[in-house]
Design a protein with these regions (language model features):
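Conserved class I S-adenosyl-L-methionine
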Residues: 1-47
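Residues lining the SAM
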Residues: 108-110
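C-terminal lobe and adjacent flexible extensions of AdoMet/dcAdoMet transferase-like proteins
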Residues: 204-249
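A short glycine-rich, Lys/Arg-flanked "PGG" loop and its adjoining helix->strand segment in the class I
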Residues: 122-134
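SAM-dependent methyltransferase
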Residues: 139-211
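Class I SAM-dependent methyltransferase SAM/SAH-binding core
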Residues: 50-95
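A short acidic, Gly/Pro-enriched loop at the edge of an enzyme's catalytic core
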Residues: 97-104
Length: 249
């Protein structure tokens, strides 16, 4: 995956997207019971750093990892602005490494789906397991094929000065891949300059994820359907799943 794939998404992510509340509610249920025993954490595919900064603000020694240099730059800037210690690492989730093992690794906003091949899941989980303390937990959410079938077959538009975005998503029925063509229109004076990005995702069956987690050394697997947390038309039952897994001691 090219490191600049989300250059424009990074630049305007906080300006355009407001998906935080459903994830905050999910964290209370899924991560909340673990927090008293979490002293070190890593947010994998950290985006613009919201969750990593939240951990750091609670006194958790935190790492933030993202492939996008622009996402990393924004996250570092936010940490400096509020005076929080946060180690930001620019790395591919399929081959990242941390300076030390941690108690918790998170990977939100279906970031785990953003790999080129289904076989890459094993590579991601191998790195996650290596970065966790024995008994540590991995918490992530993943889009399922139903999400591709229902939500990745439309066009989404948003306009918030100085940028507008058109996202056209496609999914070939019966496959485990989906693609979005993203057109950014950034205002420059009286004109708009157009920029393009391509976003691709793959998905796995429940059984495939279970097998991959077990083979990577995880146990105590638990899942939650995302629909009750989101309560919107794009996240129907079966579309997105939250996962929690423990690295075997």
């Amino acid at each position: 995956m090219p490191s600049d794939i989300y250059r424009w998404l990074a630049r305007y992510y906080d300006h355009l997207f407001e998906f935080r509340r459903p994830f905050e509610e999910a964290r209370e249920v899924i991560i909340g019971p673990l927090l008293p025993r979490i002293y070190t954490a890593c947010d994998l595919c950290c985006g613009t750093g919201g969750l990593a900064l939240s951990f750091a603000s609670q006194g958790v020694r935190t790492f933030a990892v993202d492939l996008s240099p622009e996402m990393c730059r924004i996250t570092r800037g936010k940490a400096r602005a509020v005076g929080l210690p946060l180690k930001v690492i620019c790395a591919d989730m399929r081959k990242f490494a941390l300076p030390e093992q941690v108690d918790l690794i998170t990977c939100e906003f279906d970031a785990i789906n953003h790999v080129p091949r289904k076989s890459d899941l094993a590579r991601v989980l191998k790195c996650v397991a290596a970065a966790l303390n024995p008994g540590g937990h991995f918490v992530f959410d993943a889009n399922n094929r139903k999400a591709f079938e229902l939500a990745w077959t439309n066009t989404w538009f948003a306009d918030r000065d100085p940028v507008a975005v058109v996202m056209h998503s496609t999914h070939v029925p019966g496959t485990d891949k989906a693609r979005s063509e993203v057109n950014w229109f950034v205002r420059q004076g009286k004109l708009y300059r157009r920029h393009q990005e391509h976003i691709e995702e793959v998905c796995w069956t429940h059984a495939e994820i279970v097998q991959a987690l077990l083979e990577a050394g995880f146990d105590r697997l638990k899942t939650w359907d995302a629909a009750p947390f989101f309560n919107d038309e794009l996240t129907r039952p079966g579309c997105r799943t939250f996962w929690r897994a423990r690295k075997r001691p």
